[in-house]
Amino acid sequence: MTSNTTAPSTADAHKYGVLFVFAAGVLWSTVGLGIRLIEDAVVWQILLYRSISLSLFLYVLIRVRSGESPFVQIRRIGFPAVVAGLSLVAAYSGGIYAIQNTSVANAMLLFATAPFMAAVLGKIVLREPVRAATWIAIAVAIGGIGIMVADKSGGVALKGSIAALGSAFGFAVFTVALRWGRTGEMLPAVFLSGLFAIVITSAICLGLGLSFVLSPSDGGIAMGMGVFQVGAGLILYTLGSRSLPAAELALLSLAEVLLGPLWVWLFLGETATANTLIGGAVLLAAIAGNALSGKRRKPPPITAP
């Protein structure tokens, strides 16, 4: 009797887990389209507005979900939460700059290297073992990256690619910091990253003489991204990841990478270069191969910048 009632429940949990995680990837994949639709604001102004809405959204969410202040949870996690929060600020900044200065396809594919960077950092910092298959996948991914940046030997596009890799490194540090703090709870650290971003971007805007007032269109898009693109995506991922193994999470995360370039092609007519497509295919093969080769420890999600 017990097995008959448990099996459908487990199957339903898996089904909804797949649905929620895929939906999170769909929301995260809109980051490129959102930034492309912003007309005048620069990276620091976009990040400021997005961080304000994200922080307010997560504060309410954490209070409702846990019944306690996010600051209580941050104190519980300790210094790793600070490291995680600061690393996300770097990741967000690099991500927005990358999308503004290279193709969305190129940026999104390079963001996807974050799990490989996290594996290497985990090995160095936490002495976590790395499977042989992961090392092979990392080598293949490096080859794909080389192909992608081969036609960007100079100029703004190369800076965008470097910023995208820097963003991926920031997300990798975030992942390792949460493992260091022995917590799978990402929301308090993401909330803290929003507060850090507000302070840092406000100071930069003051220093550069940038206006704190954006056009209704730019401000609305940036704040909408904080709630819907980042915040709602986090909720769906948190709900779905509880019932899925790490290998499935890694495969479902590819939805974000694949759909991001699709949106800007459909709505804005933006295309990718041949090098980006070929190198991206190699990179995606490395990610998928690593996921299929065996289950890994379930990592916190790599959120869209």
Model-derived features: positions:
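Hydrophobic alpha-helical transmembrane segments of multi-pass integral membrane proteins
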Residues: 15-23, 45-61, 79, 137-140, ...
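Specific alpha-helical transmembrane segments that line the substrate/conduction pathway
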Residues: 45-56, 88, 96-127, 167, ...
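Hydrophobic transmembrane alpha-helices of multi-pass small-molecule transport proteins
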Residues: 58, 88, 130-150, 167-171, ...
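Specific transmembrane alpha-helical segments of multi-pass solute transporters/efflux pumps
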Residues: 63-106, 111, 147, 226-244
